[in-house]
């Protein structure tokens, strides 16, 4: 590690004396100015007397605040050098995660820098960016660190690079979604338990996890088990707290499992109507396959028609046929009869009101 660190949120009133007051063992402070305007940049280089002093300042930055209340942003590289490295976007991080926690998690991938996005008051937004040296490290980190735990939450790793042609070539400008797995699926609530004792039963395993939340399904088979919770938050808590938990003298290991088939879950009579088909624009030939888009194109004619489905939809409880279901397609004969009856009624009314209209003169009393 170098003995120099970069302060990337330098404020106008911060002079060298103030920087020496908030950091220990400072040897030199270098300021930089714009070559054209002559204005001092919001980045300065701080040289410490030793590598240990620089490392201590970097580790303590998450607990320090400036007079204005903003958190200190120390980094090993300046802001203008970061575009030359490869970047990843991380979401769903714990509010207490700092840059040092992310560094320890990704340091085996040629880690360069990390930044946690914070609000004005210094609270975390649960979003962070990391910079790595090589493109291969980016690809490996995106696959291997997907769903990894950092403090109390499993993080989601996203690639920042995007191909413009990918979005323009897709129907309706919808990008091709990334495939979901058991780590990234936001609806996955299944937990896999490894290294279970041989004499443990399904009910006993269920009793150890009931305090985390509602459990839909539990199974024990060949020293392993599967637990399906009602919500993902319950599963995250269980993995975080019960991993390496000693059970009958054996430490169990927990990880995400593949979502089970709906046939395994207990069936319940539902009184809800079937969901409508996904609406699309008339210019689109297919239903958008991106489930994360905030946009919802509306086409009421397509939404009320089930002709595009391969099989008839499920009917609500109590209906023996689809005649009373408002979203099933109406037979053409009924539509034709309704149209002819409406035309006949309009013509009859026009004939009845086709008498000559005479002007009416009101006499003034």
Curated annotation (Swiss-Prot):
PROSITE patterns linked to this entry:
RRM
Cellular compartment(s):
Nucleus
Task: Indicate yes or no for the key word Metal-binding.
Answer: no
Q: InterPro entries per the record?
A: Nucleotide-bd_a/b_plait_sf, RBD_domain_sf, RBM42_RBP45_47-like, RRM_dom
Superkingdom as given in the UniProt entry: Eukaryota
Task: List cystine links.
Answer: none
Gene inactivation phenotype reads: Leads to lethality.
Q: Which residues form the RRM domain?
A: 3-79, 86-162, 189-259
Recorded GO cellular component terms are: cytosol; nucleus; U1 snRNP
Q: How does it assemble?
A: Component of the U1 snRNP complex.
Instruction: Give the protein name, as stated in the record.
Output: U1 snRNP-associated protein usp109
